[in-house]
C-alpha cells in the first residue's frame, strides 16, 4: 500500500540559504521551483528520502522548516490570509494540513514548536 510521507527538517548552517538566494536573485521562481533548485545543490539531507520513497511508489514531500524565505514563499502562494505576520511554526502547521501526510518524519529540528 502506498502512503504519503512528509519529512520536516532544518539545516544547521543557515548561511547556505543566503548564498543560494544570492544565486537566484534574478529568477522569479515559484516555491516548488525554488525548492527544486535548492535540493539540486544536495546540501545536508537534500531530498534523498523523497527520491527513494518515490521509487517505492510513495508520495513524498520535504519541508526545510528554518529556510525562512522558502517558507514565506509557500505561505504567499498557498494561504489566502495575511502571511507576512505568520511565523515558521504557523506556516508549517498550514503545510501539514495542506499535504495531509500519513507519516510525518521530523529530523534535526531544534527550532520547531508545534
Language-model regions: role of each:
Residues 10-13, 42-55, 64-114:
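Extended catalytic core of nucleotide-activated donor transferases of GT-like folds
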Residues 1-65:
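N-terminal subdomain of nucleotide-sugar transferases
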Amino acid at each position: 500500500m502506498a502512503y504519503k510521507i512528509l519529512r520536516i527538517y532544518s539545516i544547521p548552517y543557515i548561511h547556505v540559504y543566503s548564498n543560494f538566494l544570492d544565486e537566484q536573485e534574478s529568477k522569479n521562481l515559484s516555491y516548488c521551483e525554488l525548492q527544486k533548485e535548492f535540493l539540486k545543490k544536495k546540501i545536508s539531507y537534500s531530498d534523498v528520502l523523497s527520491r527513494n520513497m518515490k521509487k517505492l511508489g510513495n508520495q513524498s514531500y520535504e519541508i526545510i522548516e528554518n529556510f525562512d524565505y522558502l517558507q514565506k514563499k509557500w505561505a504567499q502562494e498557498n494561504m489566502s490570509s495575511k502571511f507576512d505576520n505568520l511565523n515558521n511554526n504557523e506556516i508549517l502547521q498550514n503545510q501539514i494540513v495542506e499535504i495531509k501526510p500519513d507519516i510525518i518524519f521530523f529530523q534535526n529540528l531544534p527550532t520547531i514548536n508545534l
